[in-house]
Amino acid sequence: MKGSDVKVAPVIAIVICFAFVSLGDIVSLKTKAKFPSLAVAIVAYLIAIWCGMPKTYPDVSGLAALGDILFPVFVAGLATSILPISIVKNWKFIIIGCIAVLAGFLCTVVVGGLFYDPREMFAAAMTTCGSGLTGGLIVLDRLKGTGLTEMVTIPLLLACTIDAIGQPVGSLITRKYAGKLIASDAYLTDKIVDHSDGGKLNKWGAPFNSSENPSPRFCAWIPPKYETEAVAFLQLIVVTALAMWLGGITGLGWSIVLILLGFGGTFIGLFRMNMLDRTQTGGFVMAAIYALLFQMLNDMTLQEIMAKIVPLLLVILLSGVGLVLGG
């Protein structure tokens, strides 16, 4: 009987999947995130299956299926992680970020398209310039939905490893702009404004423009005593379902609609900040998403990865150059 065909108990499968996730977390903490958790977990999983470990663990555990379902909920949680007032105060950051992303995207598609399939470069650029793992999984979902499964290799590899590359670039751009802010005393000015706005309270006693009432104008809809973990999770699931429906009838796709609904819901008082954290399920949701990636990687061989090394490095190089120049 082949190792990949071995039947395993769901509980054992869950233990194995969580072991890889935990290993990634431990190594990331030990190395101060020099080796990101996801990259470590992915490398460990690939080595294990190439050495004969059964590939059935993500499926038998049920985590991969949950990851597929919960990933949009994770995106909904991300959409509630920014204070509306921060968007206004940090408009320079946003403009610089948009220019950098556009430059990186165009550099990857235009220059990379001269050497490889432009469609493949487009999908890769959406991953490197579209918020890493989150953008990569959205791209993979769209590729599979349109039947372009032959183009998933590079976006999948990038989704698993891009944080290890993107974090230093993001840090460079942030330090570059932060230096200008400090030099112009803009940072201190923002701090003074923050303190002067802190006295206005909503009817529940929480300050406006705070994590408990992110909206600058509207009171939180749900009284704090009723926003339990289950209620917070229900809010995320409802807005996710609404985004799926609206994305289908408008053609915009669920991800764009979900981000807009998340931002809008935060502004009008429907959501508080960091809704996924309030459900106390963030760790489990991420473990399920990791298992989903494990499942996607099951059929990937070392030879296939080596064959994509050159275009993979080209995408990372072009995206990095574009992001730095644009920022």
Regions found by a protein language model. Give the residues of each.
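Short alpha-helical transmembrane interface motifs in multi-pass membrane proteins
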Residues: 8-9, 55-60, 89-93, 120-122, ...
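Structural signature of multi-pass alpha-helical membrane transport proteins
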Residues: 2-65, 78-80, 203-304
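Transmembrane helix-loop junctions in multipass membrane proteins, especially transporters and channels
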Residues: 29, 33, 54, 109, ...
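Long hydrophobic alpha-helical segments that form multi-pass transmembrane helix bundles
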Residues: 153-167, 171-221, 225
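Juxtamembrane helix-boundary/capping and inter-helix hinge elements in multi-pass membrane proteins
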Residues: 32-34, 80-87, 115-121, 141-152, ...
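Alpha-helical membrane segments and immediately flanking helix-loop junctions
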Residues: 115-152, 156-157, 161, 169, ...
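Entry/N-cap segments of selected transmembrane alpha helices
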Residues: 65-71, 78-110, 156, 231-235, ...
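Hydrophobic alpha-helical transmembrane segments in multi-pass integral membrane proteins
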Residues: 52-54, 108-113, 138-143, 148, ...
